[in-house]
A protein has these predicted regions:
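Histidine-centered divalent metal-coordination motifs
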Residues: 31, 113
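N-terminal hydrophobic or amphipathic helices/low-complexity stretches enriched
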Residues: 1-16
Length: 114
């Protein structure tokens, strides 16, 4: 990985953290520590290693992101929005009734598998 790629990933991780904290703050509910702690890993997966396609989210050969730390899902939601899988404004609906984005990963969002 080049220095430029490393800097770009650090910037993505910072953006994930900002968006996760913003989502949790707006929802007035959640655990920011979990999302903050997985931001570097999530950024590396979604923006460097994983083969995914927002134009074809059910692509058979796509990589899967396994998140076993449920409280950290705001970081994953932010990554999905930043990659173009969900509209950015959907992040403002975290934990609201009827939202596909809940405090733990749930199948209301078609990209989440449990």
């Amino acid at each position: 990985m080049t220095t430029q790629e490393m800097i770009a990933l650090k910037n993505k991780a910072t953006e994930l953290r900002i968006r996760a904290v913003d989502m949790i703050h707006k929802s007035k509910s959640g655990h920011p520590g979990g999302a903050l702690s997985v931001a570097d890993f999530t950024a590396a997966c979604y923006f460097h290693f994983m083969k995914v396609d927002p134009e074809n989210p059910r692509w058979e050969d796509r990589d899967r992101f396994v998140l076993s730390k449920g409280h950290a899902c705001p970081a994953q939601y932010a990554a999905l929005a930043m990659k173009g899988f969900i509209p950015m404004e959907t992040l403002d609906t975290l934990r609201k009734e009827g939202s596909p984005l809940q405090g733990h990963p749930c199948m209301n969002l078609s990209l989440i598998h449990i």
